[in-house]
Amino acid sequence: KSNNMKAFTAFAPASIGNVSLGFDVLGAALAPVDGTKLGDEVEIKAAESFSLETVGRFAHKLPGDADSNIVTKCYHYFCEQMEKAGKTTSPVALTLHKNLPIGSGLGSSASSIVAAFAALNAYFDTPFDEDTLLIMMGELEGQISGSIHYDNVAPCYLGGMTLMTGSDAPVTLSLPLNDEWYYAVCYSGISVSTAAARDILPKQVEMATALTFG
């Protein structure tokens, strides 16, 4: 949404990746049954110089240095891609409403990334199409987790359940959902980063094990 002062707010929902046997390729966006918002928001408005403010329930869990925040990195990456495309940018003030717990398995980083890029793309008059923006989101997600994957950013950005294609166009396909499907999501309060979780996984899995457990 926006107002006459050219300020935008973008919301990005929580998501779950690695759905069932779809490791790194199948993800789903989450929406509470009571209609409340579950996700991060990013506000953007014009400024004389770039700034990032963090607010919200889990803002205190973020790096104290704004330059280390993924939203700041999204801004700089967006500006780099704009320059490559021969387009201009200007300084903005960003506010991240950090409403998702970090390292929770709810796509916390993806939510911040998607909200940031969606806000930036809207503010600068939509210079990038859906697939291009999604690839950019995957690049930034990869900076956090150690490898590019879309199973959180894709459903977070597009909604519903998404299947990654392995190509750049389209990056993902939307899968049909049954309106009567509901997910029970439990958060233990334990924080485990995506990078740490991936390091725990074995580098190889025997064929018999893979066939047995999918």
Predicted regions and their residues:
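ATP-binding N-lobe of GHMP and related small-molecule kinases
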Residues: 3-104, 122, 126-128
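Predominant activation on well-ordered alpha-helical scaffold segments within soluble catalytic domains
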Residues: 39, 72-76, 114-121, 134, ...
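DPxDG-like acidic metal-binding loop motif
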Residues: 106-130, 157-159
